[in-house]
């Protein structure tokens, strides 16, 4: 218990690497404790070690298969690791367990987009836009519309993203982070500044 408490105190102070060390010591003394495994998963995820986080989330999932937070974070870790098909399956499971789950729809939308399932991606982004869209939802829907060849719809969605962001600079910052994803979907690099000029 001492190492769990120490780990938790370190975790609360955002000292994730040190918290992991304490939790691992607790795990040596008392293996496969669900609480400990959950906190190891959280710290590894916050430290961007998605593979390690995934292995601990999977241990927690074995004990609590219907835990929606665990399902969501497994899907998120898989997506971060580029395992989009498997990630989408977890987001679909989350959507099944928790109706009208916007964070599941976001996961399905992004994984579908990256997996070139554009109609499915657009279906989920449109569901989000009907409910409680964020600036990123409009932007991602714009990406999908663009890759589907609908420039008019893409510019309208990007425009809504700029409005939701409050300013163009924040939108451009988000947009630049997705440049590689757009190129992988077949958008030509020279078309990106042309699209941005339309906005």
Which ranges hold each PLM region?
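TPR/TPR-like (Sel1-like) alpha-helical repeat modules
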Residues: 130, 143-170, 196-197
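Terminal, low-structured helical/coil segments at or just beyond the last alpha-helical repeat
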Residues: 164-199
